[in-house]
Amino acid sequence: MIAVAAAGLFAATEADACTGIYLTAQDGSRVAARTVEWAATPMQCGYVVSPRGHVHQSFTPTGENGMKYTGVYGYVGIYTEYEPFIVEGVNETGLAAGLFFFPNYGEYAPYDKTADAKTICDMQFVSWVLSQFSTIDQVKDAMSRINLVTLDSKIGAVHWRIIEPSGRMVVLEIVGGVPHFYENQLGVLTNAPGFKWHLTNLNNYINMEPGSAADQTLKPGITLQPLGHGSGMLGLPGDFTSPSRFVRATFFQTTSPTWATGRETVVQAFHILNNFDIPIGSQHAKADIPKGLPSATQFTSVTDQTALKMYYRTAWNSNIRCIDLMSIDFHKVKYQSHPLDKTQEQPVEMIKIN
């Protein structure tokens, strides 16, 4: 089973593209949102409800023999391919975490088979964070007590964002076997290269501003005028590469109006991330276009860390669904998992004309 899941993740590295943003409402609600575009084929995705006291078993490249730990906190998380591989989630304290592919730049320390008792697979790191901690500093303090490994070097590395309900966010990247935490005051994250590179790259777009550019008179009788609204954003990159998505997400997030409530901000987050839905056919040569996948964006999730609600929609069903963590008794609830879609079909509301 683990080998099959790893094979699916290897396929995901061929078309990995995740975009994350962060918004704050006027009432103080904090909203973390992201897309997940993985693989050239439909992935098995679902959500899990993990209670307090649940025993988690970590994997290593040699099997189910990694660190075993008991959950301190309950959480809800979305997995891909295999239930323990949580890619985005939030726990009952409001701490949120997610992983984003980081190919060709991240590098973990070599696997040490003599240290299996403290070894965690990178795809299970989010689950470990959500089940054990309520603050970023607790995570940072615990890093020296674990070894992070990959199940297969062909899969490539990931990096992570961890977000407190206060709005503090860090990005964790492991390069040369050394973990690096970066405070993320911007709130945007995509994929490779590293987070600091993306921040530097924003300087290339210093001319960008919302609205329309002013008229420019070149000489008497010759005046250049905007051809439409939004000309202040001329030059904004529109392709699907990680650097371009980071730039777009930054400007869409920072120019977004601040809505009054968390609920309105959740809807705004979905609207912003509409711009990062990747149409099938745009990332592959015609002969390689995947079958049965309506969008490369397999799901989009939005988490209201203040209200403790996790929302999502999928490539097959764009209706928004919500899981309310406050309605869950994490002491009594049983561990459970469910597919994101009961049926992979878009519901359509028929309008009757009298």
Task: Walk through the language-model features, giving the residues of each.
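C-terminus-biased signal that marks the final domain/tail of proteins
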Residues: 16-31, 39, 44-45, 142, ...
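Compact, glycine/acidic-enriched structural inserts
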Residues: 48-66, 104-146, 334-344
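N-terminal signal peptide c-region/cleavage motif recognized by signal peptidases
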Residues: 12-13
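A contiguous strand-loop segment
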Residues: 17-114, 154, 354
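Structural recognition of the beta-strand scaffold that forms the well-ordered cores
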Residues: 31-33, 96-99, 161-163, 171, ...
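Aromatic- and glycine-enriched pocket-lining scaffold segments that form the walls
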Residues: 136, 140-174
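Aromatic/basic-lined ligand-recognition segments
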Residues: 174-178, 183-186, 194-195
